[in-house]
Design a protein with these regions (language model features):
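Positively charged n-region of N-terminal signal peptides that target proteins for export
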Residues: 1-4
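Bacterial Sec-dependent signal peptides at the C-terminal "C-region" and cleavage site
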Residues: 8, 12-24
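Exposed boundary/loop context
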Residues: 8-9, 88, 280, 339
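Amphipathic, positively biased hydrophobic alpha-helical segments used for protein targeting
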Residues: 10-11, 106, 298, 305
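Active-site histidine-anchored catalytic micro-motif
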Residues: 20-292, 296, 300, 317-325
Length: 353
């Protein structure tokens, strides 16, 4: 999550998924909202990967990953480290709905109705599987809301890295707003039921053909520039920062790594969400809904497909103050938030196969 810094964009018509193109047969494209923190052009992406000394040497094929979505300058090589194991052509993206409160959205997953999303190497097609899933869900469990997708940065951060290694990717963007655990269970069950039917009908393999990418930034920590809120329960000196980091690693180790289970997913929720109000933070991970919803979907999908259990591997953890920011200014990019002991963000990367 970033400090409030958004660019004005044209209002977009909120269309149904059953209307893929406008009357003039022009494709409906979702444009990039954050061209400061993320790459918009191919030359920017090529330059970033060169500066990161990227080599595509990951022999693993991940079925699911949990990845950050903050400025490239801060997250750095954590992006390719986690995303280069995503080999599937069709990728279901579970993102954060940072502005859900502004649109009074909760307890429904949020789809878009765009034909494609703008990306550095050309528009990325939205998979036809999206509409198939949407049509299978009761109206009460989803909404199609292009406006919130158009101002949300959590998914567009990932697409350039995914597209860099596979120009043919197709995506299914999903935002997860405030949501109770019971509602997560209900919706994920129905999504998995339909997804299983689609995979069987088309001979699609999980990992090879379809993958799930879940995004969250980890703790948003500090006592400055958080909209007047204090997110530093351990303090902001060196000891407080160390304790906050240790708390982060405890969450990752006990909830996100090893064999995935409903108990671990519930435990993650208990770490991050207030027990008496699921809308409120306990520990400030912006993906306090996208992570459990995405992992529940993965857990249930494994139960009806692979049936061998899903296991999470810790890839890395870093923060926006661990290392000097990657220099991106010569690429006409920058940062959208400060990074110091009074304002920093954590980044967790976990992969599942």
């Amino acid at each position: 999550m970033k400090i409030p810094l958004f660019f004005l964009i044209p209002a977009l018509i909120i269309g149904g998924a059953c209307t893929p193109k406008s009357k003039d047969n022009t494709a409906h494209i979702r444009t990039v909202v954050d061209s400061v923190g993320f790459a918009k052009y191919d030359w920017q992406m090529d330059s970033i990967m060169r500066r990161l000394n990227y080599t595509s040497d990951n022999e693993n094929t991940w079925r699911v990953v949990v990845t950050p979505h903050d400025d490239y300058a801060y997250v750095g090589d954590l992006y390719p480290k986690i995303l280069n194991g995503v080999k599937a052509k069709t990728i279901i993206l579970f993102g954060v709905a940072h502005k859900a409160r502004n649109f009074n959205l909760e307890n429904k997953i949020i789809f878009d109705s765009f034909d494609a999303w703008s990306a550095p190497y050309g528009n990325v097609k939205v998979s036809d599987i999206r509409d198939d899933i949407v049509f299978s869900l009761p109206d009460s469990l989803y909404t199609i809301h292009n406006e919130i997708h158009s101002v949300e940065h959590s998914l567009e951060a990932l697409i350039p890295f995914l597209q860099y290694q596979n120009r043919e990717i197709e995506i299914i963007p999903v935002l997860v707003p405030y949501m109770s655990y019971d509602k997560m269970q209900e919706i994920s069950e129905l999504i998995v039921k339909r997804l299983k039917q689609i995979m069987d009908k088309n001979g699609l393999s999980w990992g090879k053909d379809i993958a799930l990418v879940i995004t969250t930034d980890a703790v948003h920590y500090g006592d400055e520039d958080w909209g007047g809120k204090n997110y530093a329960p351990y303090g902001t000196d060196s000891i407080g920062t160390l304790n906050a980091r240790n708390h982060e690693l405890e969450i990752i180790d006990s909830c996100l790594t090893g064999v995935v289970s409903e108990q671990k997913i519930r435990k993650f929720i208990n770490y991050t969400v207030q027990e008496n109000d699921y809308r409120e933070y306990k520990w400030t991970w912006c993906g306090r809904y996208s992570v459990p919803f995405g992992l529940l979907t993965a857990y249930k999908l494994d139960a009806v497909t692979e049936k061998k259990g899903l296991s999470g591997t810790f890839i890395a953890y870093s923060t926006s103050i661990d290392n000097p920011a990657l220099n991106v200014e010569d690429f006409n990019m920058g940062t959208t938030a400060p990074a110091n002991n009074h304002h920093w963000v954590g980044y967790a990367a976990v992969a599942y196969k």
